Amino acid sequence: MKNRVNPFNPFCYIIIALTLVLCLSSCKTKSFKQEQAELQKVSVTLDWTPNTNHTGIYVAKELGYFQEQGLEVDILQPGQNVTDQIVATGKSEFGVSYQENVIRARSENIPLVSIAAVIQHNTSGFASLKKAGIKSPLDFEGKRYGSWDSPSELAILRATMEKYGADFNKVTVISGIYDFFSTIGKDADFEWIYYGWDGVEAERRGIALNYIPLKEIDPVFDYYTPVIISSEDYLAKNPQTSKKFMTALKKGYEYCIAKPDSAADILLKNVPELNPEQVKRSMQYLAKEYKSDALVWGIQNPVVWKRFCEWMYQQRLIQLAVDPDKAYSNEFLPQ
């Protein structure tokens, strides 16, 4: 009688199982490599060293939101270059900048476009040590102002003082001030800070401040800072890629709003040199500010663009008037 293969022989099942595992593994490896090869590479250049303004970008990359949209995104720092120039010349597809920079660039025929407001309202203002007794812009007279040497910065300071009937010429401007905590009360009596970073850090250190928010001085100063930018040329030629980028980025910032502690951990994982306590506090503050009273994260109000464009022109911060409707766009945000 001929030998028959027992169809219930366990060794047959082992061989079949191993064959299936190897086939599936091979398919998965091929699929992963194919997926990686198909990802479109783009970059986003930050405006400054990494901080909590940028957390949504790191979250979108870390949690695979960019990859879900078919994008491989490099997060770059500007180094000695200016982000606006990097984006305008096509060396980076996207960047982080400020509303006043976009307006100034467009007045010089550099067609940058803001495609999202990272924070819905201006969270910056003038800060001083409480013991300095600076409670209103009237108290700026006779004091030293620590400046980072921005033309719009000094124009806003001057306009603020004039509105309150104070004399800007009675302020001593100290140039080259960039580190609030090492200079306030020593080299300068008051400085311009972003509350979501330096303000919450002062709270953590137990440093009592007097703080005058810009948006409470005049509605025109409630402009967008920072913003996500691209160039007109790139947006026109790559509308779908731009929409994919913004879809992932919006999801990243929505995560920051919903889970600020987890988002802080992601930023710290990618930028371990940051102070964990400062990042955690900053994220708790910004989670309420990223979207604030807007319906969706990133949306830009035409009124904000119109009034600040007009103000910059009136103050002669730009030589040519800028069409505000061309300086920003909401069309790349997911509906």
Q: What does each model-found stretch correspond to?
A:
Residues 22-26:
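C-terminal motif of bacterial Sec signal peptides marking the signal peptidase cleavage site
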Residues 35-177, 182-185, 189-193, 222:
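Short, glycine-/small- and polar/acidic-enriched structural segments
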